[in-house]
């Protein structure tokens, strides 16, 4: 039993048992740990945990993330689930660090890395705190049992060989820019899912794609990407999220990485060069033309842009001085053909006519999440956790 206040954070839903019902994989952040300034021993030795549950509440397995998987925003400890080996049961992928302990379904445990290592400051830390030292691991595990198939040195290194200065390498020295991680399951060949990893958004960024051998669960590198050239049009184009989409409709998925798109072969497909932003949406927003489109807000060069997802040709853009921060695109009304785009510091945009919609108010459309809620074919928007 836990003695502290654990707060539910992210949840992943997947079919990990093969019984026809989904299971939940839920991350719980230890708010007592944060309130006590992330002391080396945590709060009573407890840290962030990840737990897998059946719908009836039975716990299948759980992970004590340990002292070295901590950040003040609680968003860089991630786990994803997908059926990469195509056996009808999803597996899991996550990043690990020294001292993480996996408590498997059979009652046994596996410690990741060196359990004696603790990279938290002796007197604790406050403010914008990230653990940015020590070993990192890529864990590929059985989703039903929690037993790892592979525990590998994390391929997207915090510092490359020969690099010693975090600030020089990433642009800050406290771990914010080096501690941005993404995971996914794109169909890069159009037939089988690959494992995708990425690191970095503001400046440099690194990516790798693996193919899974279903028989051995070994991971084979499909391609890698590494951009650390500040004069490159690809540099600093990442967002706080990314997407997977077949933008050119060739049957193979691309990586939609903020202001740029990476082709299924790991080469750059197109980029706007507009830099970093916070929110992006990709889809067939204009059904009257071929291919998909992207609607983004912008921070480096505010405010937003609407563009061809394949070529990055900009159809419409609003400029200004404010970091928009949020944007949304969806088919919110039958009064207008196609989708509507909306960002902070702007009014609604027709993603068919490529211009602002005269007389339409943004009241009633929030800018965080799309959802189908009331049974019709129009989308609704959802904001926060209070049901707005």
Name the predicted role of every residue range.
Residues 1-388:
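Beta-propeller-forming repeat regions
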């Amino acid at each position: 039993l836990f003695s502290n206040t654990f707060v539910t954070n992210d949840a992943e839903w997947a079919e990990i048992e093969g019984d026809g019902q989904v299971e939940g994989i839920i991350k719980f952040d230890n708010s007592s740990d944060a309130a006590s300034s992330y002391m080396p021993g945590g709060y009573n030795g407890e840290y962030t945990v990840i737990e897998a549950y059946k719908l009836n509440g039975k716990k299948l397995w759980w992970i004590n993330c340990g002292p070295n998987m901590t950040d003040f925003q609680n968003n860089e400890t991630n786990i994803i689930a997908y059926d990469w080996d195509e056996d009808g049961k999803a597996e899991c992928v996550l990043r690990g660090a020294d001292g993480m302990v996996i408590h498997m379904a059979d009652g046994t445990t596996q410690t990741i890395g060196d359990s004696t290592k603790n990279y938290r400051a002796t007197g604790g830390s406050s403010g914008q705190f990230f653990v940015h030292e020590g070993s990192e691991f890529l864990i590929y595990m059985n989703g039903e049992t929690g037993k790892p198939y592979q525990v590998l040195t994390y391929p997207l290194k915090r510092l490359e060989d020969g690099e010693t200065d975090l600030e020089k390498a990433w642009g800050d020295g406290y771990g914010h820019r080096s501690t941005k991680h993404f995971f996914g399951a794109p169909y890069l060949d159009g037939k089988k899912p690959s494992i995708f990893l990425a690191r970095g958004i503001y400046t440099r960024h690194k990516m790798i794609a693996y193919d899974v051998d279903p028989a051995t669960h070994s991971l084979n590198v499909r391609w890698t990407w590494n951009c650390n050239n500040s004069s490159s049009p690809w540099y600093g184009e990442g967002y706080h999220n990314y997407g997977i989409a077949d933008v050119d409709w060739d049957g193979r998925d691309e990586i939609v990485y903020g202001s740029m798109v990476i082709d299924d072969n790991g080469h750059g497909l197109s980029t706007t060069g507009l830099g970093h932003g916070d929110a992006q949406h990709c889809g067939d927003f204009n059904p009257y033309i071929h291919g998909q489109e992207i609607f983004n807000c912008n921070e480096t060069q505010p405010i937003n842009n609407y563009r061809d997802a394949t070529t990055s040709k900009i159809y419409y853009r609003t400029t200004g001085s404010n970091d928009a921060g949020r944007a949304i695109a969806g088919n919110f009304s039958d009064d207008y053909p196609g989708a509507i785009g909306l960002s902070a510091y702007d009014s609604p945009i027709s993603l068919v006519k490529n211009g602002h919609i005269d007389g339409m108010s943004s009241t009633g459309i929030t800018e965080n999440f799309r959802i189908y809620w009331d049974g019709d074919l129009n989308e609704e928007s959802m904001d926060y956790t209070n049901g707005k």
